[in-house]
């Protein structure tokens, strides 16, 4: 059924910019969850909308980057109990080319330890980052200690899905779900004018045919390692 199909495709989905404009609202989060997603991860626009603050502090299955300041609403790790195994999902934000934030390399070790101490046999990281080198380095840093790490933020799917030497599934960026003929989801003409003139421009979402992008990681439940990866684009 639809629920089983969604679970096969993904246990988590990045909900960044699901609200009109950017950020996320409680109603857009509920819409994503109603589609069958088990958990929503976020990124650098997590706190853009104040309406989401109480929702982030609730028990709803939504997390924001774990390396946000401790005063920020929400949490950065979630344990999903599927019955047959526990899956930990960790959300991190990169420090290169984005707003100042605690170094993700300084917090990930304790997060992995926390996931394992709570019985998670599978650990997945959503690394919301701009710099490809930072994403790649993080992949190698956690290789063998987590099941899979996927990058988000650039809205552009990369073609480097792979299994790292110690069994961790990796992709630099899973892409976006949104209008195919667009500039990262934004209407083409305003984006061109902004880049051409350098003048303030009001961006609007593009309409038209949409694409769903992502990456499927096949993970062995016993070893917690990725055995196969496949790009998704529909």
Residue map of PLM features:
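Extended active-site neighborhood of metal-dependent phosphoesterases/phosphodiesterases
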Residues: 33, 39, 44-89
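Divalent metal-coordination and catalytic microenvironments
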Residues: 40, 90, 124, 153, ...
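Conserved, well-structured core segments that form or line functional sites
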Residues: 109-113, 120-132, 139, 143, ...
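Single conserved hydrophobic/aromatic residue that forms the stacking wall/gate
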Residues: 1-9
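Active-site beta-strand/loop signature of hydrolases that rely on acidic residues for catalysis
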Residues: 10-19, 40-43, 124-127
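Conserved beta-sheet core of the metallophosphoesterase superfamily
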Residues: 13-14, 30-42, 54-64, 132-202
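Binuclear metal-dependent phosphoesterase catalytic core
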Residues: 67-68, 73-89, 161-234
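Binuclear metal-dependent hydrolase catalytic cores centered on His/Asp/Glu-rich metal-binding motifs
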Residues: 73-122
């Amino acid at each position: 059924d639809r629920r089983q199909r969604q679970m096969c495709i993904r246990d988590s989905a990045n909900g960044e910019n699901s609200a009109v404009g950017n950020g996320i609202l409680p109603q857009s989060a509920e819409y994503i969850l109603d589609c069958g997603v088990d958990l929503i991860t976020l990124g650098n626009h997590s706190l853009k909308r104040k309406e989401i603050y109480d929702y982030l502090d609730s028990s709803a299955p939504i997390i924001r980057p774990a390396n946000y300041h401790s005063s920020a609403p929400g949490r950065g790790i979630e344990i999903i109990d599927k019955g047959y195994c526990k899956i930990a999902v960790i959300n991190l934000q990169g420090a290169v080319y984005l707003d100042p934030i605690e170094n993700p390399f300084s917090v990930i070790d304790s997060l992995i330890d926390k996931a394992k101490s709570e019985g998670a046999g599978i650990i997945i990281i959503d690394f919301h980052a701009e710099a490809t080198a930072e994403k790649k380095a993080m992949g190698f840093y956690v290789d063998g200690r987590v099941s899979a790490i996927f990058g988000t933020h650039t809205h552009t799917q990369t073609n480097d899905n792979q299994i790292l030497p110690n069994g961790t599934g990796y992709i630099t960026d899973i892409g976006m779900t949104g209008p195919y003929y667009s500039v990262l989801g934004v209407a083409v003409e305003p984006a061109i004018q902004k880049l051409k003139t350098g003048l303030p421009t009001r961006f609007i979402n593009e309409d038209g045919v949409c694409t769903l992008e992502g990456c499927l990681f096949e993970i062995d439940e016993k070893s917690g390692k990725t055995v196969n990866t496949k790009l998704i684009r529909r």
